[in-house]
Curated annotation (Swiss-Prot):
<comment type="similarity">
    <text>Belongs to the CTNNBIP1 family.</text>
</comment>
<dbReference type="Pfam" id="PF06384">
    <property type="entry name" value="ICAT"/>
</dbReference>
<protein>
    <recommendedName>
        <fullName>Protein LZIC</fullName>
    </recommendedName>
</protein>
<dbReference type="GO" id="GO:0010212">
    <property type="term" value="P:response to ionizing radiation"/>
</dbReference>
<dbReference type="GO" id="GO:0008013">
    <property type="term" value="F:beta-catenin binding"/>
</dbReference>
<keyword id="KW-0175">Coiled coil</keyword>
<comment type="subunit">
    <text>Does not interact with CTNNB1.</text>
</comment>
<feature type="coiled-coil region">
    <location>
        <begin position="2"/>
        <end position="63"/>
    </location>
</feature>
<dbReference type="InterPro" id="IPR009428">
    <property type="entry name" value="ICAT_dom"/>
</dbReference>
<dbReference type="InterPro" id="IPR036911">
    <property type="entry name" value="ICAT_sf"/>
</dbReference>
Length: 190
């Protein structure tokens, strides 16, 4: 055990990221296939995925209470799970990039969306929703937003995203964020 747990920590982190990717991909696939599914089938599958996210969240909580070296690396995943559970973000791709702390890819996605809006491939409402999500994620990752982006965010951020940002800033500590995410899961089940 000369690595003093570094190898194990690295492998655990990789496994957790893969699990989060799988769940986010499942949510994204579900949204893409929504038209092909009847309402009950869609709701049931979404409920199952949210339950899996909740179980994953519980696992993270147990890991964090026993292994403090993982706390910083897992905090991004926690916020992504919180966003997915509370449905603050509607776009699984944004959640995944946020969890992996990939601001460059978020900015690339934003540029692609702006282009798609200009050529008519993306509706304005969907563009606005996804742009707000991406800008909020970038802000939470500590990225500097332009004055135009800040103005866009102020004008278009909904109550749910504002609450997500406020809560994630105020709570800060992993246990409190997990407690809120757990509460949101319970609320979503009702």
């Amino acid at each position: 055990m000369a690595s003093r747990g570094k190898t194990e920590t690295s492998k655990l982190k990789q496994n957790l990221e893969e699990q989060l990717d799988r769940l986010m991909q499942q949510l994204q696939d579900l949204e893409e296939c929504r038209e092909e599914l009847d309402g009950d089938e869609y709701e049931e599958t979404k409920k199952e995925t949210l339950e899996q996210l909740s179980e994953f969240n519980d696992s993270l909580k147990k890991i964090m209470s026993g292994n403090m070296t993982l706390v910083d690396e897992l905090s991004g995943m926690q916020l992504a799970i919180q966003a997915a559970i509370s449905q603050a973000f509607k776009t699984p791709e944004v959640i995944r990039l946020f969890a992996k702390k990939q601001p460059g890819q978020l900015r690339t996605r934003l540029a692609e969306m702006d282009r798609d809006l200009m050529v008519g491939k993306l509706e304005r409402d969907l563009h606005t929703q996804q742009k707000v999500e991406i800008l909020t994620a970038l802000r939470k990752l500590g990225e500097k937003l332009t004055d135009d982006d800040e103005a866009f965010l102020s004008a278009n951020a909904g109550a749910v995203l504002s609450q997500f940002e406020k809560v994630s800033t105020e709570l800060g500590s992993g246990d409190k964020v997990l407690a809120l995410a757990g509460f949101e899961v319970e609320k979503a089940k009702k």
